[in-house]
C-alpha cells in the first residue's frame, strides 16, 4: 500500500524540529505520515493533527494517527494505527468506518496470528 511511511516520535522527531522534517517529507516520495506523539496532551495532538491533515491533503500524503482513534476520526485522518493495548481493532473499525485504514501492531508470533485473523 505505502512505499514509504514517516513515523513521528517524541524523541527522534521532537516537536521543536517537526516543521523542518515535514518540509523535507512533503517534498519527498514519502506517501504516508504516522502521527505518533505519545506524550502530547489531547488538545495539542488534536491541533497538530488538524494542521497536519491540511498539509497532507495539499501534498497528497496519507495521514495515520497512532493509538488515538478519537483524534483520527475528529480530524478526518485517513486512518489510525492501534496496538494490542489500545482500542480493539473491531471498535476502531466501527468508529472510523470501512474506508479508513487501520493498522495493528504485532510484537510476537501470537499477536501476529491474532492480527492475521482480523476481518474488515
Model-derived segments and their meaning:
Residues 1-89, 94-110, 114-120:
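Conserved N-terminal beta1-alpha1 strand-loop-helix module at the mouth
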